[in-house]
């Protein structure tokens, strides 16, 4: 089975004084979440598309999908967790409850507030995760990256040609991710916010798929303005 897991657990705190979580904010006439879901619906390979959202927003999510005529039987809205990785585990649990989990099942996880992913990115994630078991979507870093442990002085300046910026989707063999997550201590689960890092720490190979510069995550008012400009400027591709 090939699962999609759309992570809509954010509350939009960096958006400022807004009445709704950021995934429900309007982008060119419809909620950001709807743009994202529509991209996944174009991919016939998905057997199931899970949308994970806070419990208090489940009804609103379902109403939003109905309002925008999204009625595909593959979609299921489930309750998210207290953090990103717990949310992914909740999706996996929902999938297991319905169908069980087999050794070759994979999940393509994606931020609900990255509405500009392309069919190419999805397709390459599916192909790569089926072959390698773990995939991250990235773009090359264009700015010099600086590390600083104390936030006051430079600790190191890595070679820029070896630096990448992480995006989503992040895609995994379900059992590989779940087993690696379950092997973590409770303390590590609290501090390890990136699913790919779980596998890297476990010594597993994570392959790279190239993303797109415009595959942005909309988390601030500035991001929302940029997103509207991307649409109006016709910068998108398939």
UniProtKB/Swiss-Prot annotation:
One BP annotation, GO: poly(ribitol phosphate) teichoic acid biosynthetic process
Pathway: Cell wall biogenesis; poly(ribitol phosphate) teichoic acid biosynthesis
InterPro entries in UniProt: IspD/TarI, IspD/TarI_cytidylyltransf_bact, ISPD_synthase_CS, Nucleotide-diphossugar_trans, TarI
Residues carrying the site annotation Transition state stabilizer: 14, 22
Short name of one Pfam family: IspD
Matches recorded under Gene3D superfamilies: Spore Coat Polysaccharide Biosynthesis Protein SpsA, Chain A
Record key words, sorted: Cell wall biogenesis/degradation, Nucleotidyltransferase, Teichoic acid biosynthesis, Transferase
Organism superkingdom: Bacteria
General function of this protein: Catalyzes the transfer of the cytidylyl group of CTP to D-ribitol 5-phosphate.
Protein name according to UniProt: Ribitol-5-phosphate cytidylyltransferase
Biological source species: Staphylococcus saprophyticus subsp. saprophyticus (strain ATCC 15305 / DSM 20229 / NCIMB 8711 / NCTC 7292 / S-41)
């Amino acid at each position: 089975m090939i699962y999609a897991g759309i992570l809509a657990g954010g509350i939009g705190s960096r958006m400022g004084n807004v009445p709704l979580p950021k995934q429900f904010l309007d982008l060119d006439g419809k909620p950001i979440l709807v743009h994202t879901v529509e991209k996944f619906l174009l991919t016939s390979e998905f057997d199931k598309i899970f949308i994970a959202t806070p419990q208090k927003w489940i009804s609103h999510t379902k109403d939003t999908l109905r309002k925008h005529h999204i009625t595909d039987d593959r979609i299921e809205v489930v309750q998210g967790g207290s953090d990103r990785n717990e949310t992914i585990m909740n999706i996996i649990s929902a999938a297991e409850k319905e169908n069980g989990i087999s050794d070759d099942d994979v999940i393509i996880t994606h931020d609900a507030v990255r509405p500009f992913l392309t069919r190419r990115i999805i397709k390459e994630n599916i192909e790569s995760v089926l072959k390698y078991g773990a995939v991250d979507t990235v773009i090359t870093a264009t700015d010099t990256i600086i590390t600083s442990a104390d936030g006051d002085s430079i600790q190191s300046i890595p070679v820029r040609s070896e630096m990448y910026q992480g995006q989503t989707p992040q895609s995994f063999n379900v059992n590989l991710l779940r087993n690696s997550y379950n092997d973590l201590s409770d303390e590590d689960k609290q501090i390890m916010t990136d699913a790919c890092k779980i596998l890297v720490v476990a010594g597993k190979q994570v392959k790279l798929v190239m993303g797109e510069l415009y595959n942005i995550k909309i988390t601030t008012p500035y991001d929302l303005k940029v997103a509207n400009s991307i649409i109006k400027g016709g910068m998108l591709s398939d």
